[in-house]
Amino acid sequence: MSELITGQYLSEFINRFQLQLPQPDNVLTHSHYFSATNRRAAVLIPIICRPEPTLLLTRRADHLRKHAGQVAFPGGKADPDDQSLISTALREAEEEVAIPASVVHVLGKLAPLNSSSGYHVTPIVGLVPANIPFYGNDEEVAGLFEIPLHEALSLSRYHSLDIHREGINHRVYLSWYENQFIWGLTATIIRHLAQQVSI
């Protein structure tokens, strides 16, 4: 894609995303975010503003207790000191991939999803300048990779699989990019983003 086309593509993506933002959740008090019965988390969907824009993804370290070795966006559970779920996503991104919160231009958020580990996860979409160096925290991240945004947002990349677990039917989505296998919550988040900006 030429630089002109990719510049237009990113502009169109931003316009479509902001025109179709999900309705906000009911207003929650700060304490409600951290109640024992309402486990909340957030991830950052970092869009790197290269001539050909990309999505930044991580592969989680193999020694982690949950979701070891899986492809994921930087993110994690909300802390009591976080002012909002946007703050959660930005803090976690800085901890995991060294993207300073101050450089991220937040476009908005997607509707929250429930994870298999019992968290209510809110994806936050943010633009990151291409000249910002980023790298993985060795304690949490085994590697980083980028997917061209126009490829990530192609709905044909995502294949559904119906599974039955603990008496409940679940539909999960699978996708591949080069040698990276993307599935579960991460694939679902990207697919939701693609659906939101598609015409």
From Swiss-Prot:
Positions binding Mg(2+) in this chain are: E92, E96
Keyword vocabulary terms for this entry: Hydrolase, Magnesium, Manganese, Metal-binding
Q: Where is this motif: Nudix box?
A: 76-98
NCBIfam families documented for this protein: PRK10707.1
Note the HAMAP family from the entry.
Nudix_NudL
Q: Which cofactor does it need?
A: Mn(2+); Mg(2+)
Q: Which family is this protein grouped under?
A: Belongs to the Nudix hydrolase family. PCD1 subfamily.
Q: What is the lineage of its organism?
A: Bacteria, Pseudomonadati, Pseudomonadota, Gammaproteobacteria, Enterobacterales
- The yes or no answer to whether the keyword ATP-binding is present is no
Q: Tell me the enzyme class.
A: hydrolase
Pfam families named among the record's database cross-references: NUDIX
Q: Per its UniProt record, what InterPro entries does this chain match?
A: CoAse, NUDIX_hydrolase-like_dom_sf, NUDIX_hydrolase_dom, NUDIX_hydrolase_NudL_CS, Nudix_NudL
Q: What is this protein called?
A: Uncharacterized Nudix hydrolase NudL
Say which species the protein is native to: Yersinia pestis
CDD domains, alphabetized: NUDIX_CoAse_Nudt7
Known EC number: 3.6.1.-
Q: Offer one example of a GO biological process linked to this entry.
A: nucleoside diphosphate metabolic process
Location of the Nudix hydrolase domain: 38-169
Which terms in the Gene Ontology molecular function aspect does this entry carry?
A: coenzyme A diphosphatase activity; magnesium ion binding; manganese ion binding
This chain's function reads: Probably mediates the hydrolysis of some nucleoside diphosphate derivatives.
